[in-house]
């Protein structure tokens, strides 16, 4: 029904996950190596010919029972749809890293000044209560740190529209404390704590918060923290 796009940027498990997706859905497309999350999604939208398109992140390990047969009615063609994902470090299950179904036209002209990509596309947002994948970001030190940093910067700064404050506090606490015994769990927690601090400090500074979408800046920040510690 809708185009499927796999978006990758230097993830160590990207090729493996891409090959698995391609084996199940041969018509899937790939956007690889585009700097900036928003720019990558804009390029993805420009490659699509359907009114909506699916986005699968490079670190997503799709569940066997998930398929791409969801159909959007005409009243929701401008709505961002997000499925749930399981976090392999702290076991949280919510929209972080989940498969997304995006409106093509609106994605092409999204507001790139906003730090949170999904809420910069449309004011209409729908959570689908189904787990689509495991977000296997904990494959190396940097990607684990980066994932914790980015998500906790967004949570702590309250930039995500319609955030539930109690839920946000619980998620922040889990990101910052749980998973020490999991692969690269310590790096994830270190990134989460640094991201929380960064988000709280810059909650009223959208320009500074937008840096969380710049992977080169994140890599520099990661190395700087490694040197400090």
Describe the predicted segments one by one.
Residues 7-8, 31-35, 56-57, 83-86, ...:
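Short His-Asn-centered micro-motif
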Residues 42, 50, 64-75:
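Short alpha-helix within the catalytic core of nucleotide-sugar-dependent glycosyltransferases
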């Amino acid at each position: 029904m809708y185009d499927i796009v796999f978006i990758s940027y230097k993830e160590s498990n990207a090729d493996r996950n891409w090959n698995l997706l391609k084996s199940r859905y041969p018509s899937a497309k790939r956007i690889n190596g585009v700097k900036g999350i928003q720019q990558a999604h804009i390029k993805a939208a420009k490659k699509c010919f359907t009114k909506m398109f699916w986005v699968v992140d490079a670190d997503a390990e799709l569940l066997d029972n998930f398929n791409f047969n969801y159909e959007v009615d005409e009243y929701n063609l401008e709505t961002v749809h997000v499925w749930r994902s399981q976090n392999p470090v702290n076991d949280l299950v919510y929209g972080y890293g989940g498969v997304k179904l995006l409106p093509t036209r609106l994605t092409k002209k999204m507001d790139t000044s906003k730090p949170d990509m999904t809420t910069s596309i449309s004011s209409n947002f729908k959570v689908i209560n189904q787990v689509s994948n495991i977000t296997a970001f904990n494959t190396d030190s940097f990607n684990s740190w980066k994932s914790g940093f980015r998500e906790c910067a967004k949570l702590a700064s309250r930039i995500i529209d319609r955030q539930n404050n109690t839920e946000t506090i619980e998620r922040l606490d889990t990101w910052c404390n749980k998973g020490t015994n999991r692969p690269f769990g310590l790096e994830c927690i270190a990134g989460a704590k640094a991201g929380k601090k960064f988000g709280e400090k810059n909650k009223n500074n959208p320009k500074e918060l937008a840096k969380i979408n710049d992977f080169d800046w994140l890599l520099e920040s990661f190395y700087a923290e490694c040197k400090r510690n």
